[in-house]
Amino acid sequence: MFSAAIGYEILPTLRASVEYHFFDDKHAGMANVTLPDGTSVAKQKTLKHGTHEYLAGMEWDITKRLTVSGGFQKTNYGLSNDFQTDTSFSCDSYSLGFGARVNLTQAWSIDVAYFWTHYNKYTKETDSYNGTGLKGTDIYNRTNKVFGLSLNYKF
């Protein structure tokens, strides 16, 4: 894995950061998959490249008691038809997240957040769908929406 990040305090109450992550998935140890021609190969070898992640975020202290934040993440896995299966698939995506912290006291705070991910549909067309000799198509897709709430105590 390779990671690079930079953060900058624009104002004492406003901060921004950008990050890049690379996961060398093409050289990871994954289980074997059977290709359409019947050969077996380590699944990671079917990727076009490793995973690239691009991130950016901002945080703003509106008051001493209230902080809001927002962020973005774009993920590209380097997918191929041979990598995708009915039991294990991935989809390139982008995510947006928003949050807030309310400082109740110096020790206690409450965080609330919402995170939404849009996954790109991946269409896999084959000439012999599941070995039937007939053309077929699989469309891989998913969605992700997360709400978070926490009560924090600082020792």
Place the predicted regions along the sequence by residue.
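Residues that define the transmembrane beta-barrel architecture of outer-membrane proteins
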Residues: 2, 45, 50-54, 92-94, ...
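Oxyanion-binding "anion nests"
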Residues: 2-30
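Repeated loop/turn-to-beta-strand initiation elements of outer-membrane beta-barrel proteins
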Residues: 13-16, 65-68, 102, 106-110
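Transmembrane beta-barrel strands of outer-membrane/channel proteins
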Residues: 18-22, 70-74, 112-116
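Outer-membrane beta-barrel translocator domains and adjoining extracellular loop/strand segments
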Residues: 28-37, 78-87, 122-130
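Extracellular loop and loop/strand-boundary signature of outer-membrane beta-barrel proteins
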Residues: 39-45, 81-88, 133-139
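Outer-membrane beta-barrel "beta-signal"
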Residues: 100-102, 108, 114, 141-155
